[in-house]
Amino acid sequence: MIVPIQCEYYALEGLGQLVGNVDLVKANLNPDLEISKIVLVMYDSRTKISKQVADEVREYFGGRVCKQIIPRSVRLSEAPSYGQPITVFDPTSRGAIAYKELAREVLNE
């Protein structure tokens, strides 16, 4: 399972709840279920909270956190309203490039 997490405070709480739910599912339904990757999304390098969340997630999950971070981007938020993926809507945007790099990272592991 690949889990995206927004680099916001409440997302950390949600991630904690998700880990608990994954443990319940593993114990009762699917012992093979694992969080294989965590993707940091909506990262804003101008804010302290983004860095703090990224640091805490990396500290807890270690190597399961993808190196490629998806930045906060106006173009990324606009693409769905046009019914298009970012790679079609604006293929040269920072967000599109970040998602392409993330795909390469995940596929190469």
Describe the residue ranges of each PLM region.
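Conserved catalytic-core segment of NTP-binding enzymes
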Residues: 1-74
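Short, charged/polar low-complexity linear motifs in solvent-exposed/disordered segments
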Residues: 30, 95, 105-106
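C-terminal boundary of histidine-terminating zinc-finger modules
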Residues: 79-101
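C-terminal alpha-helix
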Residues: 101-109
